[in-house]
Regions:
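Bacterial Sec-dependent N-terminal signal peptides
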Residues: 1-21
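Interaction-mediating elements
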Residues: 18-153
Length: 153
């Protein structure tokens, strides 16, 4: 269930909404749950600008942290579900990077999506490619799976 509905958000070329609708603390959108706002303020107090989005069955917010795009998802009642962090390979931990490159020599990591949720270790969805192929790898703990393996051109 954690990965359900994430396909749209795992696209490497997806960018957050423009800064024109940024919301500062204390100016919560009227449709955003007070519970979600309280959780966000408690866990991301350092964030200065955030954009909120409301969907029929959930809400989420987007903010930037350096070269990372953070998306924090809440259910329709305002309870935190997971956080999706997208970033370039330069921000990937050395341990994860080595694990990938030791198993996929000749590939270059192109983009990372990290999914954090309560009671689970982070899940990494990593895009990588070589001259002929594109792969999407899923890493969770010691488990590594090829989720997509595509031929170029």
């Amino acid at each position: 269930m954690l990965l359900a509905g994430l396909y749209f958000f795992l696209q490497p070329n997806l960018h957050a909404a423009s800064g024109s609708s940024n919301v500062k603390f204390g100016i919560a959108p009227t449709s955003a749950s007070a519970r979600a706002m309280a959780h966000f303020k408690e866990n991301f107090a350092w964030v200065q600008e955030v954009t909120w989005f409301n969907e029929p069955d959930n809400m989420y917010c987007v903010f930037h942290q350096g070269n990372m795009v953070n998306r924090v998802f809440y259910d329709e009642h305002g309870y935190w579900q997971y956080t999706l962090i997208s970033y370039p390979p330069s921000s990937l931990t050395k341990t994860i990077k080595e694990k990938i490159l030791n198993n996929f020599g000749g590939y270059k990591i192109t983009y990372v999506n990290e999914i954090r949720s309560e009671n689970y270790e982070p899940v990494y969805m990593i895009s990588m490619e070589n001259e002929d192929n594109i792969k999407i790898i899923r890493i969770s703990g010691d488990d590594m799976q090829v989720k997509q393996d595509l031929k170029k051109g």
